Amino acid sequence: MRIIDEIILYENPEPLLVSKQGIFPGIVKLQDNSLLTLFTIGQAFDSADQRTYVSKSFDDGRSWSKPKPLHNHIYKNKEESESLKPLLLQNNKLLAIGYAFVRPDSLTPIVNPNTFEILPLNNKISISNDNG
């Protein structure tokens, strides 16, 4: 196997000031041949502030639009860390499907290191009729 080309979906714009990383990407090719990616941005791999972002490419992934949050929902009672993937249906509806771990606070890990229990999670779905 050899690497033909390297594509960067997300780079932290302020790495000296803010710790952010992009993880768990999913990419679909839309009907107009553009690419759409959903991925998660957060402070750390297991951080409670993980949110799903969307970005598009019109040049086969060589460059990407500035990431935008998939939604603007504000969690009032308990925070959720989420990850969703795109799925293009035959009728050209675009789904974002995934899950969100319910976080009792920002410092509780997803997996309890003593009991190995996993935090509860909620299934998530979002539907787009306009290619995201």
Residue ranges and their predicted role:
Residues 1-132:
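Asp-box/BNR beta-propeller blade signature and adjacent active/binding-site loops
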